[in-house]
Amino acid sequence: MTDVNGAPADVLHTLFHSDQGGHEQVVLCQDRASGLKAVIALHSTALGPALGGTRFYPYASEAEAVADALNLARGMSYKNAMAGLDHGGGKAVIIGDPEQIKSEELLLAYGRFVASLGGRYVTACDVGTYVADMDVVARECRWTTGRSPENGGAGDSSVLTSFGVYQGMRAAAQHLWGDPTLRDRTVGIAGVGKVGHHLVEHLLAEGAHVVVTDVRKDVVRGITERHPSVVAVADTDALIRVENLDIYAPCALGGALNDDTVPVLTAKVVCGAANNQLAHPGVEKDLADRGILYAPDYVVNAGGVIQVADELHGFDFDRCKAKASKIYDTTLAIFARAKEDGIPPAAAADRIAEQRMAEARPRP
């Protein structure tokens, strides 16, 4: 079902002619009193209620917002399937600059729209929305995760996200070098924010050599002051050219692997927390042609979604960490499937996810 009454022609064209097809439901939301304009996209509920965050962003057009919601919802179906969750994929986008129009009234109105879906969609934080925002949304909608601990939530998910990426690195090491240990391996991390700085801690604890960069020089300085063994370089271009780099971890913006970076990348493995690391589908073949092993981003960075899903059942950190530790086995299985089928790891991950969704019991 798609609610389309009064939708502009370009929005309808995006809905029905997108190459990200197959969505079960798309809801266009508007609340004039608060200024809310939003899109909720449910790609699949085959595995269970759709789970995915709410992005608050100043899209150039409503059609662009719809296209982003469709793409992100589809991605969440695959991420949740590979994380072993009993959840399908969904995503919501709120149109507008959060610095200008975000208000309690708007978030409450949004919560009412999510609640109207009766549990088919469970929301959480994403770009432009935060724990405090989810606390407000939850006042109107019980299908809300990513809340503060004071309001029954789990809070910051960066700890488990970094732990999952770390497990992905260990799996890549096992596959490529026959040993999961990262001791004496050189790992370059681009982006040492909430996730990246936790990743630094995991790697140092195991005895890895760590090289970092970030556009925020004060953040880099804080890390090198705490850990004098960490080496800082000027920018990502310098990082990907570091001699004897074993693993490259993009942990900032998407599109880090592109036609400019892949030809000069010195690492043997790419495994990081950033979303949408491949600038276009052909990039993974370029990596394979250079003998670089790619750990699919949506598989290794699933620690965060594992946490918000667990919140629905009463958050337990140890239970979540045990689930996130399985990212190691999942990543190994992807590498094995890729080798068996003669395809890149990202394509292998997609096949495994699609198989799990296809085998799931259809839900009304």
UniProtKB/Swiss-Prot annotation:
<protein>
    <recommendedName>
        <fullName>Valine dehydrogenase</fullName>
        <ecNumber>1.4.1.23</ecNumber>
    </recommendedName>
</protein>
<dbReference type="GO" id="GO:0005737">
    <property type="term" value="C:cytoplasm"/>
</dbReference>
<keyword id="KW-0560">Oxidoreductase</keyword>
<comment type="subunit">
    <text>Homodimer.</text>
</comment>
<dbReference type="InterPro" id="IPR006097">
    <property type="entry name" value="Glu/Leu/Phe/Val/Trp_DH_dimer"/>
</dbReference>
<comment type="similarity">
    <text>Belongs to the Glu/Leu/Phe/Val dehydrogenases family.</text>
</comment>
<feature type="active site">
    <location>
        <position position="91"/>
    </location>
</feature>
<dbReference type="Pfam" id="PF02812">
    <property type="entry name" value="ELFV_dehydrog_N"/>
</dbReference>
<comment type="function">
    <text>Oxidative deamination of branched-chain amino acids. Oxidizes L-valine and L-alpha-aminobutyric acid efficiently, and L-isoleucine and L-leucine less efficiently. Does not act on D-valine. The catabolism of L-valine is the major source of fatty acid precursors for macrolide biosynthesis and a vital source of antibiotic precursors. Uses NAD; no activity was found with NADP.</text>
</comment>
<keyword id="KW-0101">Branched-chain amino acid catabolism</keyword>
<comment type="pathway">
    <text>Amino-acid degradation; L-valine degradation.</text>
</comment>
<keyword id="KW-0963">Cytoplasm</keyword>
<dbReference type="InterPro" id="IPR006095">
    <property type="entry name" value="Glu/Leu/Phe/Val/Trp_DH"/>
</dbReference>
<dbReference type="InterPro" id="IPR046346">
    <property type="entry name" value="Aminoacid_DH-like_N_sf"/>
</dbReference>
<dbReference type="InterPro" id="IPR033524">
    <property type="entry name" value="Glu/Leu/Phe/Val_DH_AS"/>
</dbReference>
<keyword id="KW-0520">NAD</keyword>
<dbReference type="Pfam" id="PF00208">
    <property type="entry name" value="ELFV_dehydrog"/>
</dbReference>
<dbReference type="InterPro" id="IPR016211">
    <property type="entry name" value="Glu/Phe/Leu/Val/Trp_DH_bac/arc"/>
</dbReference>
<dbReference type="InterPro" id="IPR036291">
    <property type="entry name" value="NAD(P)-bd_dom_sf"/>
</dbReference>
<feature type="binding site">
    <location>
        <begin position="191"/>
        <end position="197"/>
    </location>
    <ligand>
        <name>NAD(+)</name>
    </ligand>
</feature>
<dbReference type="InterPro" id="IPR006096">
    <property type="entry name" value="Glu/Leu/Phe/Val/Trp_DH_C"/>
</dbReference>
<dbReference type="GO" id="GO:0006574">
    <property type="term" value="P:valine catabolic process"/>
</dbReference>
<dbReference type="GO" id="GO:0043837">
    <property type="term" value="F:valine dehydrogenase (NAD+) activity"/>
</dbReference>
